[in-house]
Regions:
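Short coil/turn connectors between adjacent alpha-helices in alpha-solenoid helical repeat scaffolds
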Residues: 23-33, 88-105
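Mid-chain, well-packed structural core segment of small domains
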Residues: 72-97
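Residue-level detector of solvent-exposed, low-hydrophobicity positions
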Residues: 13, 84, 91, 113, ...
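N-terminal alpha-helical interaction modules that lie
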Residues: 1-79, 111-115, 138-145
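Amphipathic alpha-helical binding modules
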Residues: 95-145
Length: 145
């Protein structure tokens, strides 16, 4: 089995998994616990610890996704998409800290999507980074101050 083919299949699986999760979040079809569990499963499949990534500053996140100085587009995209989904889930929830959680997650997602080249994820069936950045900007602007 070619390593590149294996990696591409894993990325495609993650894309499908996260696209389905986005639909469940927007449709209100999952509890917060189920969403968090699926996000952690996706991160683990990608070799990442999402709880750790959520707690990191942008500078530390950069070290996680670019340990040799060059951004790993797969890891960057995965963390960006997970952060975006985290923001969606928080924005649509009724929690007391939901606005702050959504803002933090969307800002993290915007930072990470901004590091990606425009065509980094177009083969995954998910929007390109520029389209995601537009959606994030709209969502950030719609949050109460």
């Amino acid at each position: 089995m070619d390593r590149r083919d294996y990696i591409m299949r894993m990325i495609e699986q993650l894309g499908a998994m996260l696209t389905a999760l986005r639909r469940r979040i927007l449709g209100g079809e999952a509890t917060r616990a189920e969403i968090r569990e699926q996000m952690h499963d996706a991160a683990k499949l990608g070799g990442l610890d999402y709880d750790l990534a959520r707690a990191m500053s942008p500078e530390t996140l950069l070290m996680m996704i670019a340990p040799g100085g060059e951004v790993d587009p797969g890891r960057c995209w995965l963390l960006a998409e997970l952060s975006y989904l985290d923001g969606l889930e928080a924005q649509l929830s009724d929690g007391t800290d939901a606005t702050d959680e959504a803002r933090s997650a969307f800002e993290r997602a915007a930072y990470l999507f901004g590091l990606l080249k425009p065509t980094a994820a177009n083969f995954l069936g998910v929007p390109e980074s520029a389209e995601r950045l537009g959606d994030i900007a709209e969502r950030l602007n719609s949050l109460p101050p």
